[in-house]
Amino acid sequence: MKTLLLTLVVVTIVCLDLGYTLTCLNCPEMFCGKFQTCRNGEKICFKMLQQRRPFSLRYIRGCAATCPGTKPRDMVECCNTDRCNR
């Protein structure tokens, strides 16, 4: 009986861990308050700053499977904990 109970506890813990989803900020503004639950396979939050023209900046935040690449003059920061891309 104890073995069965222990087995059920272990299976429950493993199943709960598999269902974890990351939460990241997701908006195109500098000051952001909108959160997104990442899809399965997206384990990275990112914050990207793109400079398109002099004095023209674009902010992008969201979820990704891998850290996004950048172009010259762009900056990106990646992290893997909830709401870490502030």
Curated annotation (Swiss-Prot):
Disulfide bonds join C24-C45, C27-C32, C38-C63, C67-C78, C79-C84. InterPro entries: Snake_3FTx (IPR003571), Snake_toxin-like_sf (IPR045860), Snake_toxin_con_site (IPR018354), Toxin_cobra-type (IPR054131). CDD domains: TFP_snake_toxin. It is found in: Secreted. Transmembrane segments: none annotated. Keywords: Acetylcholine receptor inhibiting toxin, Disulfide bond, Ion channel impairing toxin, Neurotoxin, Postsynaptic neurotoxin, Secreted, Signal, Toxin. GO terms for cellular component: extracellular region. Expressed by the venom gland. Belongs to the three-finger toxin family. Ancestral subfamily. Orphan group II sub-subfamily. Binds with low affinity to muscular (alpha-1-beta-1-delta-epsilon/CHRNA1-CHRNB1-CHRND-CHRNE) and very low affinity to neuronal (alpha-7/CHRNA7) nicotinic acetylcholine receptor (nAChR). This is Weak neurotoxin 9. It comes from Naja sputatrix.
